[in-house]
Amino acid sequence: MKWIGKNVVYPQTSIEMNEQGRVFLSFVVEKDGSISNVKIERGISTDLDREAKRVIQKMPKWIPAESAGKTVRCRARLPINFRLN
């Protein structure tokens, strides 16, 4: 997801502490494609977890799931990688 990579802001405190890793989040894609109920499933640190959640909440609308020809809510999981160069 290029959008995530372009919109993540690595927290300065995490850079100073050399924090890296992958944050796993879950969320609901609503019938209109909006994102709700964002939760950290497995995190790294308070700052990186907060940034991962912020980016997911700001994402553009998704294409909603369909069941029997109708749009439905669905739960999704997504990892966000934090890596220092």
Regions found by a protein language model. Give the residues of each.
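Short proline/glycine- and basic residue-enriched helix-capping loop/turn segments at helix->loop/beta transitions
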Residues: 1-25, 53-85
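A short, well-structured alpha-helical segment
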Residues: 2, 30, 34-64
